């Protein structure tokens, strides 16, 4: 039991020194903060995937993967003639609203 507590304290100390000790916890100033950040980021991604659907989430990932420090994913897709179907980005709520107009 003491080793678990000691390990937790060691991780917390490393986090306080600015090291990321939890995957997805970047920016947290303590072990607990990093755990909360990682959980929120994971949950946010899952929620977004549910909103967009698998195809939309995949298309958005393709576009984001093309981005660089100099150019957005949209600019690179246009330059390299890569087709990104943004109609798949629409959430279920947006589609319902557009149909009612």
Swiss-Prot record:
Basic and acidic residues bias: start-end ranges:
7-17, 38-62, 71-89
**Comp. bias intervals (Polar residues):** 90-101
The UniProt entry's GO biological process terms, in alphabetical order, are:
response to abscisic acid
Q: Which PANTHER family match?
A: EM-LIKE PROTEIN GEA1 (PTHR34671:SF11)
UniProt protein name: Protein SLE3
Name the Pfam families on file. LEA_5 (PF00477)
According to its UniProt record, in which tissues is this protein expressed? In seeds, expressed in the embryonic axis and in the cotyledons. Not detected in leaves, stems or roots.
- Family listed: Belongs to the small hydrophilic plant seed protein family.
Chain positions covered by the region annotation Disordered: 1-101
Q: Which cysteines are joined by disulfide bonds?
A: none
Instruction: Quote the InterPro entries the UniProt record gives.
Output: LEA_5, Sm_Hydphi_plant_seed_CS, Small_hydrophilic_seed_prot
The stated induction of this gene product is:
Down-regulated by drought in 30 days after fertilization seeds. Not regulated by drought in leaves, cotyledons, hypocotyls and roots.
């Amino acid at each position: 039991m003491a080793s678990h507590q000691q390990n937790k304290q060691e991780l917390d100390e490393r986090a306080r020194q600015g090291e990321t000790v939890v995957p997805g916890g970047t920016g947290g100033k303590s072990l607990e903060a990093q755990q909360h950040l990682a959980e929120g980021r994971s949950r946010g991604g899952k929620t977004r995937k549910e909103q967009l659907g698998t195809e939309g989430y995949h298309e958005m990932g393709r576009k984001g993967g093309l981005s660089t420090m100099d150019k957005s994913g949209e600019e690179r897709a246009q330059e390299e003639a890569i087709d990104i179907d943004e109609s798949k980005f629409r959430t279920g709520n947006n589609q319902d609203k557009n149909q009612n107009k």
